[in-house]
Curated annotation (Swiss-Prot):
Positions of post-translational Phosphoserine modification: S516, S518, S558
HAMAP family tied to this protein: SPDLY
Protein name, UniProt field: Protein Spindly
Entry GO MF terms: enzyme binding; kinetochore binding
Subcellular compartments: Cytoplasm, Cytoskeleton, Microtubule organizing center, Centrosome; Chromosome, Centromere, Kinetochore; Nucleus; Cytoplasm, Cytoskeleton, Spindle pole
Function of the protein: Required for the localization of dynein and dynactin to the mitotic kintochore. Dynein is believed to control the initial lateral interaction between the kinetochore and spindle microtubules and to facilitate the subsequent formation of end-on kinetochore-microtubule attachments mediated by the NDC80 complex. Also required for correct spindle orientation. Does not appear to be required for the removal of spindle assembly checkpoint (SAC) proteins from the kinetochore upon bipolar spindle attachment.
Gene name in the database record: Spdl1
Length: 608
């Protein structure tokens, strides 16, 4: 029995050793599995990131390829259009050059023929002049010889009268002969000139015939081209008529489709014309505003720098907050890992205790203890697996949340960039609007509001000698007030208004505007003075008034009438004098202020 017990105990020890080894190997396998799982997760994440990058690069490259293909197509179309245009221009230039060359050649030929004719005429004239000169020289020599002979004969001997008469007749006959010779020579010269002119005219006739033939050939070619164009036009008209008949035929298929296409074509042509007009106007506007935009570049750059530094600081703070959050999560995970390592070490220490102290224990106690440990081990394995699953799920959730947070962060950053760009564009437009206002708004004059007043309108005024004296006194006071300085004029005006119980709606001090007005706030005063009502005034002399009273026979009532009419006339004169004084004071006390249209650095700072 003891041998069996020892054998069983040895077997139990071997089984426990094997279990411990199996547990140790299982832990090692679990650790390796976790490491492999973590490596697999990392590889999967890296693979996903690289796949996303490659997909993004692929999408970007596809877009670039599409854009480049479209650009190549557009460039090829433009090249073909340019080639056709250049061919047409080259043909037109060739035709124009051919025509101009032909015209120049004809002009040069005409000039050459004219020069030839002039040269022939000059040669002929030179020849004729030489011949005349020779004849004149011969005649002169002959005459000189005759004179010499006559002088010798007169000196040597006295000649008879008959000989002298014969000699005179001979000289006269020779003179006639010479005159006839000269006439013959002149006629020959004229004949030669006429022959030259005839030859030149014949050459011109030949040249004109050649030009006529060329023009006839050109006319024939133009006529043939016109006939061909007419034939082509007739063919096109026939085709157009067939197309219109087919379009108007309701039984033909695709009529509505062709009509829709035609309507769309017409609409697109109209839209194209509108867009061309808009493009031209915008092009002019851009060329006009380019100079204005160059002035605002410095201010806009400073504003963008300020805004960019602010956004970078906010982005940096957000990134620091995210880093702190991730550091806290890492610390929490490290604490959990430390706890698990402590539990693992405790479990290994419990399993590695020597079992020599339990040699005296009973077999049933050892089996019970081993079963209990086995149950605990299974339970711990299950908990470990569940925690691993939860940990992997939490990791995936954390990765998903981090990816989502990064996407949201990117979107937020892009939105901030767009906001920054929109604000900068808004600032640009505001600055541009201010400059355009400064440039194009005319200098407006600040009008001083005219004070409203109340006047009594009397249909008839009858003056008396006393009233004339009062009017003279009022005019004297008015002259005295006009000589006063502006401050005293205002005081006198206000005092007179207080005495007459007429209130001003606006004080004179409110009319004075500050000199430092901004160029963007132009004051538009809409208050305008009311038009004065018309009233009839009849002023008569005292003699006329007395005559009227005598005619009417109301002499005893005249003092009462004058006393009654005296009061309203006095009131009216006082109101008129006060209004005149008020106008003069307001006009003299307020200076007109002009606002400069040029943009100064102080005004630009106020705009910023």
């Amino acid at each position: 029995m003891e041998a069996d017990i020892t054998n069983l105990r040895n077997k139990l020890k071997e089984c426990e050793d094997e279990r411990l080894k199996a547990a140790h190997y299982g832990l090692q396998l679990l650790e390796r599995q976790t490491e492999l799982q973590s490596q697999l997760d990392k590889c999967h994440e890296e693979m996903m990131i690289t796949a996303e990058k490659y997909n993004q690069e692929k999408h970007a490259l596809q877009r670039e390829v599409e854009l480049k293909s479209r650009m190549l197509d557009s460039l090829s179309c433009e090249c073909e259009a340019l080639k056709q245009q250049q061919k047409a221009q080259l043909e037109q230039l060739e035709v124009q050059l051919h025509r101009s060359h032909r015209q120049e050649v004809s002009d040069l030929k005409n000039k050459l023929e004219n020069l030839k004719v002039e040269l022939d005429e000059a040669r002929l004239g030179e020849k004729q002049l030489k011949q005349k000169l020779d004849l004149q020289g011969e005649l002169l020599a002959h005459k000189s010889e005759e004179l010499r002979l006559l002088s010798e004969q007169r000196v040597l001997s006295s000649m008879s009268s008959e000989l002298l008469a014969l000699e005179t007749e001979l000289t006269a006959a020779e003179g006639v002969k010479n005159a006839l010779k000269e006439e013959v020579n002149e006629l020959q010269y004229k004949q030669e000139q006429l022959e030259c002119l005839n030859t030149s005219l014949l050459h011109q006739v030949d040249r004109l015939k050649e030009e006529k033939e060329e023009r006839e050939r050109e006319a024939v070619s133009y006529y043939n081209a016109l006939e061909k164009a007419r034939v082509e036009n007739q063919d096109l008209q026939v085709q157009l008529g067939h197309a219109l008949q087919q379009a108007a035929d309701p039984n033909s298929k695709g009529n509505s489709l062709f009509a829709e296409v035609e309507d769309r074509r017409v609409a697109m042509e109209r839209q194209l014309n509108l867009m061309k007009d808009k493009y031209q106007s915008l092009k002019k506007q851009n060329a006009f505003t380019r100079d204005q935009m160059n002035k605002m570049k410095l201010q806009i750059s400073t504003l963008l720098r300020m805004r960019g530094s602010q956004t970078e600081f906010e982005q940096q703070e957000r990134l620091f907050a995210m880093i702190e959050q991730k550091n806290g999560e890492i610390k929490h995970l490290l604490g959990e890992i430390n706890k698990l390592e402590k539990f693992k070490n405790l479990y290994e220490s419990m399993e590695s205790r020597p079992s020599t102290s339990d040699t005296a224990c009973v077999l049933e106690d050892s089996t019970y203890y081993s079963d209990l440990l086995q149950l605990k081990l299974d339970k711990l394995n299950k908990e470990n697996e569940s925690t691993k699953d939860e940990l992997s799920i939490q990791r995936m959730k954390a990765l998903f949340e981090s990816q989502r947070a990064l996407d949201i962060e990117r979107k937020l950053f892009t939105n901030e960039r767009h906001l920054q760009l929109s604000e900068s564009e808004n600032m640009k437009l505001r600055a541009k609007l201010d400059e355009l206002k400064l440039k194009y708004e005319p200098e407006e004059r600040i009008e001083v509001p005219v004070l409203k007043r109340r006047r009594e309108v009397l249909p008839l005024n009858i003056t008396t000698p006393e009233e004339t004296e009062e009017t003279a006194a009022a005019s004297a006071t008015e002259d005295g007030v006009s000589r006063l300085p502006p401050h005293r004029e205002e005081e006198s005006c206000l005092n007179s208004l207080k005495d007459n119980t007429v209130q001003w709606k606006q004080p004179a001090s409110s009319c004075v505007q500050p000199a430092s007005l901004s160029p963007h706030k132009n004051l538009h005063l809409d208050t305008q003075p009311k038009k004065e009502k018309k009233c009839v005034k009849l002023v008569d002399s005292p003699a006329n008034i007395e005559v009227l009273h005598e005619q009417s026979g109301n002499t005893p009532n005249s003092p009462r009438l004058t006393a009654e009419s005296k009061l309203p006339t006095e009131v009216k004169e006082r109101i008129e004098t006060t209004s005149k004084l008020g106008k003069g004071a307001c006009k003299k006390s307020h200076n007109i202020i002009y606002v400069s249209s040029k943009s100064a650095p102080e005004t630009q700072c106020s705009q910023q």
